[in-house]
């Protein structure tokens, strides 16, 4: 209740609702936004990584913008980075996506620079200052490219994207039979 009062008295809702589509219910704020901020505010003496995984187009980036703005207003040292910012640069991205059966320029597993992502997150977790890559999807006629770096010294880092936390099938496992992490196994109609 104290958290709710702090959010209401700070004007958080009025100053940040413009980041969310007008047609969307503000219930998302109470059910998702505030619980994430509550978790972020819990212990600011150590660095905490929060993963946010959801399907493309459902509002992860919009929520991330809201979280950063709300956290700034509340004095929380929170920053959001998208897994999309860790796409390979243009040349490597084109090589990685060449011949994919869907003909898409990015987004599939294999289009992200996972060593850079892991190295960056490990360095950040150890307390080091890191620079996060930025990716602009509008460059190269919508195929996208890296477009610079931004500084990150936040105590709380939210990593948003799809496939965040997903594990690949192990050798010998199949979608039909599942793996230990697929329970129950996926049916053909799924």
For every predicted segment, state its role:
Residues 57:
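Walker A (P-loop) phosphate-binding loop of P-loop NTPases
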Residues 143-190:
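ATP-dependent NMP and nucleoside kinases share a basic, alpha-helical "lid"
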Residues 63, 67:
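Hydrophobic positions on the alpha1 helix immediately C-terminal to the Walker A/P-loop
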Residues 1-31:
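Charged, amphipathic alpha-helical linker segments immediately N-terminal to NTP-binding catalytic cores
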Residues 20-21, 79-82, 86-140:
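Conserved nucleotide-sensing/catalytic segment adjacent to the nucleotide-binding pocket
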Residues 60:
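Conserved lysine of the Walker
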Residues 31-43:
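Pre-Walker A adenine-sensing motif
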Residues 54:
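The Walker A (P-loop) glycine that initiates the GxxxxGKT/S ATP-binding motif of P-loop NTPases
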